[in-house]
């Protein structure tokens, strides 16, 4: 597959996947999703790869969904169907959680919308001091998708997840550390070195043990993840994406103003 928005390399047992769609701050569209699925799959089946490192070459980790694309769908009229893209990103997060290999995410700047669960699907997150995690879906009149509600509930519980999902309140780096979402917070200039250091630690560790630890934790905590994505998340997001509030949320975002929701 010819990569347009990612870079993929393997060295010293580490597969590095670098998102590099800087113009749109690594917004996740169909092309980006397809490339992530491909690269994670390549790393998973490569016996030379012991650890996966996910990072960004842009000024943010990921801006989430491409709202400009959504706005074009809104303006075109008719039923809006984001099931395919949401399904692809759900496949990415589920693939990361069920991977046999340890995954480290280096989060710089904002991880917004779908970018949040993308980071959260890694086994360990190293964040820089400017990192910010935001469930921004509600600001568009949507619900969390790509596994965000599920993954965050598993990590910090129902009440805290409700707080961030219903308000869109950012979780800053120091708060993410206190909540146990990230392993370490470092200055921006140290992020690359610290995340690579952790990845190398796992390369030199008991790999069979790591694989089976992941298998146990996935079975204990995430065995119903696919059912949640298919039976709960996709239908609720489909309903929300065909409301007047979603149209208004997209328009407000593009016009850089506060949304005037009507509750319908």
Mark where each language-model region is.
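Terminal low-complexity tails and localization/encapsulation signals of metabolic enzymes
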Residues: 1-3, 251-264
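C-terminal long alpha-helix characteristic of the crotonase
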Residues: 22, 126-131, 182-231, 244, ...
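Glycine- (often His-adjacent) and acidic-residue-rich active-site loop
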Residues: 56-94, 111, 224
């Amino acid at each position: 597959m010819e990569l347009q928005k990612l870079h993929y390399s393997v060295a010293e047992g580490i597969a590095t996947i670098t998102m590099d769609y800087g113009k749109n701050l690594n917004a996740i569209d169909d092309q980006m999703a397809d490339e992530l699925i491909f690269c994670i799959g390549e790393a998973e089946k490569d016996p030379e790869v012991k650890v996966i490192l996910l990072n960004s070459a842009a000024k943010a980790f990921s801006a989430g969904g491409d709202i400009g694309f959504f706005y074009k769908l809104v303006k075109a009229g008719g039923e809006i169907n984001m099931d395919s893209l949401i399904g692809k990103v759900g496949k990415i997060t589920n693939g990361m959680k069920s991977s046999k290999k340890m995954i480290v995410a280096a989060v710089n700047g904002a991880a917004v919308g779908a970018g949040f669960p993308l980071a959260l699907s890694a086994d360990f997150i190293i964040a820089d001091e400017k990192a910010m995690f935001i469930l921004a879906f509600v600001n568009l009149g949507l619900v969390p998708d790509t596994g965000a509600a599920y993954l965050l509930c598993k990590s910090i519980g129902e009440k805290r997840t409700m707080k961030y999902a219903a308000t869109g309140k950012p979780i800053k780096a120091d708060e993410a550390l206190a909540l146990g979402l990230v392993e370490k917070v470092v200055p921006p200039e140290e992020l690359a070195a610290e995340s690579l250091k952790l990845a190398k630690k796992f390369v030199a560790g008991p790999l069979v043990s790591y694989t089976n630890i992941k298998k146990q934790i996935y079975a204990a905590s995430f065995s119903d993840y696919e059912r949640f994505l298919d039976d709960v998340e996709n239908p609720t997001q489909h309903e929300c994406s065909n409301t007047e509030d979603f149209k208004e949320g997209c328009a407000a975002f593009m016009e850089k103003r506060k949304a005037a929701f009507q509750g319908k």
